[in-house]
Amino acid sequence: MKLSAVKGALSFLLAASVLGGCSQNPDGLTPVTLNEVAHSIFYAPQYAAIELGYFEEEGIDLTLVNGKGADKVMTALISGDADIGLMGSESSVYVYQEGSEDYAVNFAQLTQRAGNFLVSRTPDPDFSWEQLRGKTVLGGRENGMPEMIFEFILKKNGLDPKTDLSIDKGIDFGLTAAAFSGNDADYTVEFEPHATALEQDQKGYVVASLGVDSGYVPYTAYCAKKSFLSERPEAVQSFTNAIQKGLSYVNSHSAEEIASVISPQFPETDVETIAAIVSRYKDQDTWKKDTVFEKESFDLLQNILEEAGALNMRVPYEDLVTTEFSEAAKDAL
């Protein structure tokens, strides 16, 4: 046998032993840990994939962790506590700008609109963004996607986020709804199910959708470290296939059917409320038809980051986005 053939055989055996030794359970499924930025009905396609068994179909044993914030998700990803992160893609830009060699690469986009809503103390069917002038709003983390989209909308409507209103950015992600109930702020920016919960408790009323008023944006995407993508491409492809199946399901079924499927993920929320929230998201075309993260979307993301003063330099699309897995998942349908 030629030396090159021996080396090739040894390399294959080593790779097989590594994959077999640390990437499969006794049941033959590959364990993958996903850290999500929030546990929200906004990510319904992901939960549909979980509840309908699409991950198991693709050979994935998924562990889901709620990171409660993009900064925490990225920390888990970089440290190795998570294999895949679901968050705003701005986080991958920040890590890349810091000069990390094993940076996070976006491989599948899930949502194409913002998923949060502006909630007022009182009903206001005639709301306009101009009404925020001089008011106090509970916002999001500085340079996080929710806050940047909010400020992007304010600027579109002639408001300076720094001088025309007061934005409280100091409350932890996911705690703003509770804070709003005992706070004197005039408005809060909320994801579901918190926005609907405030309405049901008559403590707040949705007056605007940030998803509608901002337009199409690459709001949340799946990413993994460059090393993970190169070392475990089969797991990434299987994961992407499952997400694509989840997207296809939500785009071809009613809000009521989707709510029934994903309800185990939200035991504290009744099915009717889940259906209403899903309908709200479907009506504004929240979910993509496929997971391909287009260059135009990445350029728009960088425009938003530049406008927010959060971008030191524009970064190459080819470095931070790969469509290899998404294209294959789409073609496999």
What are these regions, as identified by a protein language model?
Residues S91, T122, D172-F266:
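Pocket-lining segment of extracytoplasmic ligand-binding domains
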Residues S230-N312:
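Secondary-structure end/capping motifs
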Residues Y43, M74, I78, S89-S92, ...:
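Extracytoplasmic/secreted envelope proteins and their assembly/folding machinery
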Residues M1-A9:
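Bacterial N-terminal signal peptides that target proteins for export
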Residues S23-N25:
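Bacterial signal peptide processing site
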Residues D27-D160, S166-G170, D186-E192, A208-L210, ...:
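Short, glycine-/small- and polar/acidic-enriched structural segments
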Residues V18-G21:
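C-terminal motif of bacterial Sec signal peptides marking the signal peptidase cleavage site
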Residues D299-L333:
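Conserved C-terminal helix/tail region of periplasmic/extracytoplasmic solute-binding proteins
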